[in-house]
Amino acid sequence: MRVSRFPFRSLLTVLLLPVTVMAGSASAQLSAEDADDTPLPAVSRAHLPPQELSAKVLYQLLLAEIAAQRDRLNLSVNTYLDLARSTGDPRVSQRATEVAVFARNPKAALEAARLWSQQDPDSDRARQNLSGLLVSEGKLSEARPYLEQMLSKAGPQTGPLFMNLHSLLAQHADKDAVAALVEQLAKPYPKLPEASYAVALAALDAGKIDRAKAAASEADAKRPGWESAALLYGQILQTGKDPAAVRSFYRSFLDKYPKSQDVRLIYARLLVDDKLFPAAREQFQAILKAAPDNPDFTLAVGLLSMQLQDYAAAETYLQKVLTLGYREPDTVRFYLGQLHEEQKDWAGAAQWYGQVESGDQFVLSRMRIAVMLSRQNRLQEGRDLLHSLPAENAEQRTLLAQADAQLLSDVHNYQEAWNVLSDGLTRVPDSSELLYDRAMVAEKMNRIDLLEADLRKVIALKPEHAHAYNALGYTLADRTERFSEALELIQKAVALAPGDPFIIDSLGWVQFRLGRLEDAQHTLKDAYDRQPDPEIAAHLGQVLWAQGQKDAATRLWQASYKANPDSEALRAALEQHTH
């Protein structure tokens, strides 16, 4: 039998405590010592009916409770509702409301809540339950007086009540009606910032953006520096699809109120979403100053430092995360392995990867060790390690096939890499990951026809796969004369992932191929500012050279090549234009 959520003895002691118990000829008064520790409902004695507990009422109480214990909820609801009507006891009506809500019987719950509110008109809890049930049943006009009464009697809790209105009203489908109701409820409180906040949030839900902005601004004016109002205003601005405007607002707010940590955290995350990594790291570092032992913020700064190739800082922050008791230490060890691998410190990377003992990163860490073995001219050892790893599901089979193909691609054995991926597709049919990787191998084999076929299949399988559109568009721009088609594909990728620096780079490259040099320079400069990648530097230099800015192009290539001496794209650009 499933354990009921309705405690049996505690309910009866609460209900029977103040009344005379009569069973046959015997009667006795329950004392406080007979009750357990369950607190009494807050019911004024003035609202308790002066009645004795008859055998019939006692039987019904027992029946209702035992029915609830045995999950016969309809019987329990009906019995409690009968008792609520006949006894006039608000505690019984409260119980009837609770059981009816749990039983998902809105009609009975609403009737019980009405009785409860009538029987104990001073009860805020009764009003809250009744108003919530009325809202859930779409009866906003009937709920309004109860909500008004709750607010008028709340005293210092009026502000918090306005802040909770959204959760109460969110379930109602007619958002315009909710916005109108909140406007009416807020009118008597022209100086209360929470009232303006509630109006702004309801207007936002209703799509009334101008009204939402105005109300959020009013909330800020009534309580300057209030972070909740600022965050809501930023959320409203985000509906305008203008990330720069949102960033500008948060930046201005933080200039005025630099201690606003909640706003700074949202701003930092927004910068990460927009791929503005240097600015994001700066904000997370400011957050970290106020909470230096927070492992999540420390990890964020470490990963952003790694993204920006500030390896020394990344090492310091990631090592610190391990000392702060981070909940997923193997994840941090994996990141440290990546950090050393990016610096071609194979021994250091293998040491960190080898310390990953469990979790999602276990197989991934061994795959990275295999890749590093291959890069040290130990290809067969690397492949043997991969083949020894367990593949317990489709995801792991996919990852292992990808890793094996990567080893072969790294030594330019593209045909065998193609074969491995094709074999993987027989095991995991229609894997968009394997199809995408096979397309990249096809490009190395100069088989643009195979690349296009695989990428179009990826797009068919996953229409939101931004990188498939980007890869196909870039290849068509770089390797064919199908520039208009390439532009259309890349614009689709930009729409799906507007802040991705590599997709922005592709857009700049197709603009260059179309002869739109000014557009190309602006776009590629944006991409490079977001991510100073060597291939982006190579493309931007090509555009600068074509514009006659040969010295600027050469300086850019040389600086980027110094930081990325293994870049084939930069080496080719320098050899072509400076020798």
What does each of the following model-derived ranges do?
Residues L12-M22:
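Bacterial N-terminal signal peptides
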Residues S25-L40:
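Cleaved targeting-peptide boundary
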Residues L30, R45-R72, S76-H579:
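Alpha-solenoid helical repeat scaffolds
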